[in-house]
Amino acid sequence: TLVESYIDDIGLTSVSLKNLGSSLASDYKRRNEFFKENSLQESVKALEYATNNGIKNLSLYTPYDFAFKYASNALEVPYAATQYEVLDYSIPFYQLVVNGLFDYSGEVINAHDEKGNQWHIMHILETGSNVAFTFSYEDSTELIQTDYKYYYYTEYSKWTQDVKEVISTIDEIGIHGCELTNHQLVANNIYKVTYTG
């Protein structure tokens, strides 16, 4: 498999895998059916191979429950359970389940800076998420005519003040190292969360 070739050829000990553990596909072509159960089995086989062959830190993007035991941390876990307007409000169900199993981060802050630091801080506190930024050392305009043009926001030097603000605010409150145990709606768009530890 692709996972095996990367591990064997490159000798990695830490990897971040975008769809493995968080995507199950199927294909119903005649005489070559591939069901979601087959996809699940192949995913588990790849995750087993990775963890049994030198991968000590495995980052997965919002992994499904079958991948929990392989994950060192989860990336880009959505703050809200759904975007459907018909619901009154959303609870961080995923975070309540995985809190204490592995670390997880929410949205990449500089990829969604239109929401503002305060918005991100409030959602980090509400969900127990880690802070997430994506950075490049070089000027990100170098990426404009490449396949990586969507990383236009990554130049580290432009984000140092935001990083300091967000991290110092979260550290001052001291939620990390604690367990998220309760989430309750107090009033419209006002939530009370409980941490223990």
Task: Locate the predicted segments by residue.
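Active-site-proximal substrate-binding groove within the catalytic cores of carbohydrate-active enzymes
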Residues: L2-G197
